[in-house]
């Protein structure tokens, strides 16, 4: 092929591949657009490639999605920002297709391209695109239009700004609910670009239209707009325009709208300020906490700590706590679970006395809840309460419940308790721990569930680190070594695991005198799984013990295992022997 023809080659391949029946080839060629554009050069990309893409009416959504994505980053390949406008026609076409994800990606790319365009080009090219989309015959075009107003508006001259505001008003009143939903979703972004004088008039009237929409799917999106608009308005305007809407929404006939209010209420409080929150929004929140729809109560319960943080403790105790008490015995387990996941955070907000008087009884009732997730959510946050009421009170009031949960029938609850033990141990101190929790830690090593046994072995290591090797030598090692003769091989394996974890904490001397002999005895076990685990443990002990011990005790044991009839035992024994040789060579 001659040099002259070479630049033609990629575009020819591309056009062939773009028309190919095989979707994978079409996709690959779209994803290589930037490479092809570089080969063509900026001018030919503008004059040949982009028009070709504009006319390309591929019917496969995956190909169109890839094209919408590529065009968003295409400015460098068409000659920079001064030519960015040539990318608008193909993106405009893509923003009117039927498939939602393609339209959304095209709108995202339009915004990306538009935000880099020069002001004069925005006025000449981008604003006319917005107007065409907003007046589109198909609802898909009008839906996409809503997402690009905030890019077009700031650089528009005053006359055009007025026109754009009136177009957006029309979209808020469109016949199709899909368009009104898009208008509600994007109102906050558009409002952020509108001058404050028009914000109070035009934008607020659009907002009011949306809040009174007969479709709940539109109203619930308007709820999100409340928080966004609230942040743009002065506090007094916010109280005048936004607050009544929120209060109405909190009593909306559709539970989905009330659910959105419950989810957004914290942000709305920030917008209106502390005083209106106390007088208007606390009653609204209380209504949501007592809503007859469980989904709404779940959303409201999950925000209870956040909401209390912006109130003073007296108001929280007076108005919110009675609802929290009711929710702790709610008929829906999911409501109780949502409450349990955040209620511990209320302790620092309410302070020590109120926590002891009001919250502790609620914690206790949730710790005894029949639904395991509720119990789990309380256990995992106990440290937040400990910081407020102190360990003495925590141990008197909650510890009996914790001990009970250590034998819970749901293994995940037992697991959460085990993971909490080292923290509890460090706070309770060694004396208290030995009295109340020591026996439990041993009991878990013989649990029916493997994850519990594994966590129990890890727990012993963390306790040995917390209280030191001497304490471990007295309270952990003898009990662990006693269990090594358990008739069930799975429990014997747990003990080997515990030994391998304890050895680095206990140090060389105790490992050689107490732990290693037990491992060597286990190497004579009749169960192959035990023997290959012995090989793994011996490998982990090599760096801990002296070289002489490795040669005198560990190597002979491994050599014996390497001649075992079982293939896995031989494999792990040889791996450990290899490890010894490597250590020898490096030293």
Swiss-Prot record:
Residues annotated as carrying N-acetylserine in the record are 2
A Pfam family that the UniProt record links to this protein: HEAT
Q: Which UniProt keywords apply?
A: Acetylation, Cytoplasm, Nucleus, Peroxisome, Repeat
What's in the GO CC field?
cytosol; nucleus; peroxisome
Q: What residue intervals traverse the membrane?
A: none
Query: What does the UniProt entry say about where the protein is found?
Result: Cytoplasm, Cytosol; Nucleus; Peroxisome
First and last residues of every HEAT repeat: 2-42, 44-80, 81-119, 158-196, 197-235, 236-274, 275-313, 315-352, 353-391, 393-430, 432-469, 470-508, 509-547, 549-586
Look up keyword Repeat and say if it applies: yes
Q: Does Cytoplasm appear among the keywords?
A: yes
PROSITE patterns, per database record: HEAT_REPEAT
Organ and tissue specificity: Ubiquitous, with higher levels in roots and flowers (at protein level).
- Name the GO terms of the biological process aspect: regulation of phosphorylation
Where this protein primarily resides, as one coarse class? cytoplasm
Q: Which InterPro entries match?
A: ARM-like, ARM-type_fold, HEAT, HEAT_type_2, PP2A/SF3B1-like_HEAT, PP2A_Regulatory_Subunit_A
Functional note: The A subunit of protein phosphatase 2A serves as a scaffolding molecule to coordinate the assembly of the catalytic subunit and a variable regulatory B subunit. Involved during developmental process such as seedling and floral developments. Seems to act as a negative regulator of PP2A catalytic activity. Associates with the serine/threonine-protein phosphatase PP2A catalytic subunit C and regulatory subunit B' to positively regulates beta-oxidation of fatty acids and protoauxins in peroxisomes by dephosphorylating peroxisomal beta-oxidation-related proteins.
What is said about its interaction partners and assembly? PP2A consists of a common heterodimeric core enzyme, composed of a 36 kDa catalytic subunit (subunit C) and a 65 kDa constant regulatory subunit (subunit A), that associates with a variety of regulatory subunits such as subunits B (the R2/B/PR55/B55, R3/B''/PR72/PR130/PR59 and R5/B'/B56 families). Interacts with B'THETA. Interacts with SRK2E/OST1. Interacts with SIC/RON3.
The UniProt entry's sequence similarity note says: Belongs to the phosphatase 2A regulatory subunit A family.
Q: What is known of its domains?
A: Each HEAT repeat appears to consist of two alpha helices joined by a hydrophilic region, the intrarepeat loop. The repeat units may be arranged laterally to form a rod-like structure.
For this entry, the protein name equals Serine/threonine-protein phosphatase 2A 65 kDa regulatory subunit A beta isoform
Lineage runs: Eukaryota, Viridiplantae, Streptophyta, Embryophyta, Tracheophyta
Gene responsible for this protein? PP2AA2
